[in-house]
């Protein structure tokens, strides 16, 4: 899948995930406060991929699509706009190393997985998230959001 298809798919997936946030969790905040949500973005690729790292030349684009506040097309700007400034999303990339996202290599080829839950569970279980990355931005005791990019 090309970058032009992969990045919008990532953004749509994140938007759909945040669409599932109960409205009451936002409205319960005081009228003049902004709720913080943290989005943990995890990357994986199949072992039989055409390249060793599909993110090698796409890291800056992926980060910008999530966090760039200078454009209304980023996830952060979009969520800020549709929530009228009541919800702020910051995306974190635990696999970022020396300026490049290093995707986790899944254990099986794409054909060996029967559904996406199998590799989603594998990713969450095997990708290390450093303690320095805040999982709970709204302090409700739960991880706010995880986005998986394959």
Regions found by a protein language model. Give the residues of each.
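Propeptide-to-catalytic entry region of secreted or membrane-anchored zinc metalloproteases
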Residues: 29-150
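Gram-negative bacterial Sec-dependent N-terminal signal peptides
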Residues: 10-18
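C-terminal segment of classical bacterial N-terminal signal peptides
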Residues: 17-27
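Bacterial N-terminal signal peptides that target proteins for export
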Residues: 1-11
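N-terminal prosegments of processed precursors
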Residues: 6, 14, 28-33
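Intrinsically disordered, low-complexity segments enriched in Ser/Pro/Gly/Ala and basic residues
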Residues: 1, 24-26, 108
């Amino acid at each position: 899948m090309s970058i032009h298809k992969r990045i919008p798919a990532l953004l749509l997936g994140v938007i759909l995930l945040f669409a599932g946030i109960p409205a009451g969790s936002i409205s319960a905040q005081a009228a003049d406060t902004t709720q913080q949500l943290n989005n943990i973005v995890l990357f994986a690729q199949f072992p039989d991929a055409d390249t060793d790292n599909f993110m090698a030349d796409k890291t800056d684009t992926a980060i910008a699509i999530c966090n760039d506040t200078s454009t209304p097309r980023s996830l952060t700007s979009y969520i800020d706009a549709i929530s009228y400034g009541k919800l702020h999303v910051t995306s974190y990339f635990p696999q970022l190393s020396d300026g490049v996202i290093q995707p986790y290599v899944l254990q099986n080829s794409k054909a060996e997985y029967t559904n996406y839950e199998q590799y989603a569970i594998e990713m969450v279980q095997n990708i290390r998230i450093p303690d320095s990355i805040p999982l709970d931005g709204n302090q409700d005791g739960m991880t706010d959001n995880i986005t998986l990019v394959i």
